[in-house]
Amino acid sequence: MKFIHTADIHLDSPLTGLSTYADAPVEMLRTATRDAFTNLITEAIEQPVDFMVIAGDLYDGTWKDHNTGIYFCKEMGRLKKVGIPVYVLFGNHDAESEMTKKLQLPDNVFTFDTRKPCTFRLEDLKVALHGRSFKEKETLENLASGYPAPVPGMLNIGVLHTALEGNSAHATYAPCSLDELHAKGYHYWALGHVHEYQIWEGASTVVFPGNLQGRHIRETGPRGAVIVTADEEGIQDIKRLFVDVLRWASLEVDASECKTLSEVVAVIGKALDGLVKNSSSAIPIAVRVIITGKTAAHGDLFGLESQLRAEVLALSVAMGAERLWIEKVKVATSAVDEGETVRARADALSDLQDLLQAAESDPEFLKNLQDELLGFINKAPLELQTSVPYFKAIRSGDLVELVREVRPGLLSHLAKVE
């Protein structure tokens, strides 16, 4: 017997971080979650599996229109034709209170109740599925504590949308502990809510499959579901099933040996080429390039993120626009011995360094600086106003981090001027 466990599909939610650029793969970004889900349904049919479990957040909230529901019904129809049932539990994003639009689902789709835990028995497979959907988005009670005892003689699967204790990066909906899940006596826990793949073996096998499609730079690497093989003795095998159509990657590039902007761009080019060549699939990659290290090129890089991105984008296009997209180029370098060098010079640069260090804790100075800078920004061409990353920080008043970030680059750049 085989089944697919998936969660956090977030149908029709956008991929973020690329759409503001004219060169962005707009159609791919718009349809990525659907395309990944279609791939999943195709895998379910081709395997084939005996059933599918969706452990919450099938949707990203109420639909903008009925097209999302119509698409889901169409894909469920594909499974119905080959006799594959689907068991859907709703989580915080698609809780009953969040969904204002609904459609009647095909009769091979079964949904877990919101009022109390319920059990679906698959008598021919000797499987019992236990679960409870969210009625409200802000479900903070321990739902697992109310799940029923395991059914004797059956493979018992608990379906639950939960943060699980220890996942502080996620909202603590339906909290419970790993020990509590193991103590329940089920063979397998099909969890959802946490977007990273995680698995624990013990009295029960507990799995977060991760989300189906990475949607931004914080969701890097391959994404998908899991396919589980089981028999009357329990869980026999779990394999990850990758169905995503675009992947996100963070690429750190050490510019320590670089002296100019051109050399930095060349090093980035080599790193991007290596990323593509080492990729195990032909799936497009959206990359954030982070330039690090103490480098003599630090002054040249200062404030040039937009230009850098254009340079790096040109490299990526040359490598094949269908494979590589640049999400962002971030400068995280520092000057080579900037502090010692500047302090050793008894001139205005030393005074400037002291002034900038003191400015970080001087609200009046920061307010005056913001007023002065806003005057320059408002006179700048509109293209610059929207493309220079620092301008946003200035408008929002986030001057402390700005001064701290620009100080090394400014001093390094001025130190070159005789």
Q: What function would you assign to each model-found segment?
A:
Residues 48, 126, 185, 283-285, ...:
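Short loop/turn motifs at secondary-structure junctions
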Residues 57-61, 163-165, 294-296:
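A short, flexible beta-alpha/helix-coil linker loop
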Residues 43-48, 79-83, 319-322:
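A structural motif corresponding to the C-terminal end of an alpha-helix
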Residues 1-68, 393-399:
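N-terminal active-site segment of His-dependent metallophosphoesterases
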Residues 55, 192, 292:
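Conserved residues at the C-terminal ends of beta-strands
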Residues 2, 16, 22-23, 51, ...:
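His/Asp/Glu-rich metal-coordinating catalytic cores
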Residues 34, 38-46, 73, 144-148, ...:
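Amphipathic, non-transmembrane alpha-helical secondary structure
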Residues 243-418:
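Accessory, non-catalytic peripheral segments of nucleic-acid enzymes
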